[in-house]
A protein has these predicted regions:
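Short hydrophobic/aromatic beta-strand micro-patches
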Residues: 51-53
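Catalytic core of pol beta-like nucleotidyltransferases
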Residues: 1-30, 38-44, 55-106
């Protein structure tokens, strides 16, 4: 992690990222905070894991990661953004199960 994030700041950072995703990429995307911050067991080395579920993802997953990485970097370099193809969200994978279990919809 590039810097320590105060416990109060992480939700605000994730919400700011969600607003940018919805305004710049996909207004209908669902954005979830997941991982250690969502489970409330983050430490000074934790990044902010955010999943973006969108029907626009899937044609080129590398491009999807790239778009999210650019947005994430502009909001906070500690954000680790993960594009989720809508079909994977519906059909459920081990990764999406983790997000559904512990994730917080922003």
């Amino acid at each position: 992690m590039l810097r320590t994030i105060a416990r109060i700041d992480f939700l605000s950072i994730a919400e700011q990222f969600a607003r940018r995703v919805k305004s710049e990429l996909d207004a209908d995307a669902d954005v979830y905070l997941f991982g250690s911050f969502a489970r409330n067991d983050a430490n000074e080395h934790s990044d902010i894991d955010v999943a973006v579920v969108s029907r626009t993802f899937g044609k080129d997953i590398s491009e999807d990661y790239g778009k999210l990485a650019v947005l994430a970097h502009h909001v906070n370099p500690n954000i680790e953004a993960h594009p989720i193809v809508f079909d994977d969200w519906i059909n459920t994978t081990p990764f999406t199960n983790e997000i559904k279990k512990d994730g917080v919809l922003l």
